[in-house]
Amino acid sequence: DVERSRGLGDVYKRQIMSSEPGTITLVPTGPLTNIAMAVRLEPRIVRRVKEVVLMGGGYHVGNWSAVAEFNIKVDPESAHVVFNEDWPITMVGLDLTHQALCTPEVQAKINAIGTPLSAFASGLMDFFRKAYKDNQDFIDPPVHDPCTIAYLIDHSVVATRRCPVDVEIKGELTVGMTVADLRGPEPSAEECHTQVATKLDFDKFWDLIIDALKRIG
């Protein structure tokens, strides 16, 4: 049973605490409410989680405000909790996902697979192509969440930069901003537990996606 006031925090807590330490990677692709609640309910989960690879944030621009991305903006307090715990975090934000554009050439490869799933995926791209053009003036639609999984499958698909990251929760104009300190030399993993995704290997990424669509059939 899910207690309304705790959301899925209890579920996260039970699953992590009942698993071997270092065997669970959290891959949130939405607001971080449930993970923050789990941490508050059972702080020991932080040491048991292998890493957190999240889709959210951005160190240059936002999409829900000038500086804030939707997943962080809608619950910045929870994001602040998650980023300030001492577990390894990779932030796959808009700076990276806006490079994962479904160009007409990519969509043609998806269509060529010729399965119901590939037709469904292509239809989604048609919808998002129009939506992104109308609302954000993108020529081609970006895909966001798959970038996190691509990184986990093959780290070489996504280049990263280690740097301190925090979430603004008080600014009049900047609530929900993920503030990445990219100044100076890159710190070591021992010095800094957060890193941001910076550059996508476009061809390798779409090869992974198209291969997955073919495998699923």
Question: Which functions belong to the PLM regions below?
Answer:
Residues G9-D10, T33, M37, V53-G56, ...:
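Active-site glycine-rich loop that binds ribose-phosphate moieties when present
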Residues D1-Y12:
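Single conserved hydrophobic/aromatic residue that forms the stacking wall/gate
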Residues P43-V49, F83-D86:
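Short, conserved loop/helix-junction motifs that constitute active-site signature segments
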Residues L54-M55, T90-L94:
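Short, conserved beta-strand edge motifs with alternating hydrophobic and charged residues
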Residues A36-L41, N63-A68, V92-L94, L101-Q107:
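A short secondary-structure junction signal
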Residues D10-L41, V53:
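Internal, conserved structured core segments that host functional sites
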Residues K73-D75, V92-G217:
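Conformational coupling and interaction surfaces
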Residues G30, V82, I149:
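Divalent metal-coordination and catalytic microenvironments
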